[in-house]
């Protein structure tokens, strides 16, 4: 549905040249929810704005629904953009218009008959859960309700693609979850292809089928969500995954934690489990094989793309030789082990 090939985007600021995107290629199949994740300034917003040519690429090809957009005339591009809805971090609603009026606007601009506008807007407001807000004004809506209006407006022309530019960044966690569930429901009901950009791996984990990691204008990793969470290939992907599972060292342990081993001290370990290593009884196996005991301090598990993954803080009791052998064995069995210190 969306095919970006060798996209490069260069901005000129006076005598300074800024390369925002460098040879980016991305394919989003029809009906998928595809996430692009990266830090601020990585090129995410530039990339998504190239899809509907709000930013025209310096080089490369943009195809949506099999149509090459970069060669279209202005009138042809305007028509093609009706098949591409877009929502933003800030809702961009017209304060002087009601909820109904905001959603109706693109249909009015397209000279849609009034009866058809009424039918379509009513249908969309019911879809996004705002069937009772026809006559409300944006000032009287919560942030989540405003974003629902923006989603309804983006769907007014019955697009095949929805672009989401940090659509939940301005929302609280509970509202974020409700908006993501709405997007997932719309994708399922309408078969809508969704491309979203975010800096939060929680967003990707919750609704995406596939994910690409962008850094300094380049896609450095892309795969299914389950594969990236199970076998991240880049340090940046690992960092984003770690951000979804975070365990703080308890204060009493922090007070006792030493950088080097002392008499009778034991290593404190941070273990990350993904894929098959989550369900395998690896800790009990290390106890049998190496005569070590693991005291679990805290642990957290989660799911992404149907794959379970988790993190654990433990004390490993045993001799230095036994604990080193146990750690090496765990690493051989796809557990990431970090020695945080000694307690």
Swiss-Prot record:
It comes from Salmonella typhimurium (strain LT2 / SGSC1412 / ATCC 700720). Its EC number is 7.4.2.11. InterPro entries: AAA+_ATPase (IPR003593), ABC_MetN_proteobac (IPR012692), ABC_transporter-like_ATP-bd (IPR003439), ABC_transporter-like_CS (IPR017871), ACT-like_dom_sf (IPR045865), MetN_ABC (IPR041701), MetN_ABC_transporter-like (IPR050086), NIL_domain (IPR018449). This is Methionine import ATP-binding protein MetN 1. It is an enzyme of class 7 (translocase). The lineage of its organism: Bacteria, Pseudomonadati, Pseudomonadota, Gammaproteobacteria, Enterobacterales. It is found in: Cell inner membrane. It comes from the Bacteria. Part of the ABC transporter complex MetNIQ involved in methionine import. Responsible for energy coupling to the transport system. Residues 2-241 form the ABC transporter domain. It is a peripheral membrane protein.
């Amino acid at each position: 549905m969306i095919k970006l090939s060798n996209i490069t985007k260069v901005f000129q600021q006076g005598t300074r040249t800024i390369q925002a995107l460098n040879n980016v290629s991305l394919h989003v199949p029809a009906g998928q929810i595809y996430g692009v994740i990266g830090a601020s300034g990585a090129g995410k917003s530039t990339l998504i704005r190239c899809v509907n040519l709000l930013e025209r690429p310096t080089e490369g090809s943009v195809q949506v629904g099999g149509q090459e957009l970069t060669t279209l005339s202005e009138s042809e591009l305007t028509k093609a953009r009706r098949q591409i809805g877009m929502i933003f971090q800030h809702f961009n609603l017209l304060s002087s218009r009601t909820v109904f009026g905001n959603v109706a606007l693109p249909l009015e601009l397209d000279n849609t008959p009034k009866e058809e506008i009424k039918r379509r807007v009513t249908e969309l407001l019911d879809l996004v859960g705002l069937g009772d807000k026809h006559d409300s004004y944006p000032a009287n809506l919560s942030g989540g309700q405003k974003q629902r209006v923006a989603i309804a407006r983006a769907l007014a022309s019955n697009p095949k693609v929805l672009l989401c530019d940090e659509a939940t960044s301005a929302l609280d966690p509970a509202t974020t979850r409700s908006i993501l569930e709405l997007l997932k429901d719309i994708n399922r009901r309408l078969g809508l292809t969704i491309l979203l950009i975010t800096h939060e791996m929680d967003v990707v984990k919750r609704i995406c089928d596939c994910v690409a990691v962008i850094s300094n204008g380049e896609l450095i990793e892309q795969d299914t969500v389950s594969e990236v969470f199970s076998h991240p290939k880049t340090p940046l992907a690992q960092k984003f995954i770690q951000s979804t599972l975070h365990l703080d060292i308890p204060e009493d342990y922090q007070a006792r934690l030493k950088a080097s081993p002392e008499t009778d001290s034991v290593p404190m370990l941070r273990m990350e489990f993904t894929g098959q290593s989550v369900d395998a009884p690896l800790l009990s196996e290390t106890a049998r094989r190496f005569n070590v005991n693991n005291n679990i301090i805290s642990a957290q598990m989660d799911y992404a793309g149907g794959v379970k993954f988790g993190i654990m803080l433990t004390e490993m009791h045993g001799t230095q030789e036994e604990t080193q052998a146990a750690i090496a064995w765990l690493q051989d069995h796809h557990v990431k082990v970090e020695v945080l210190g000694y307690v």
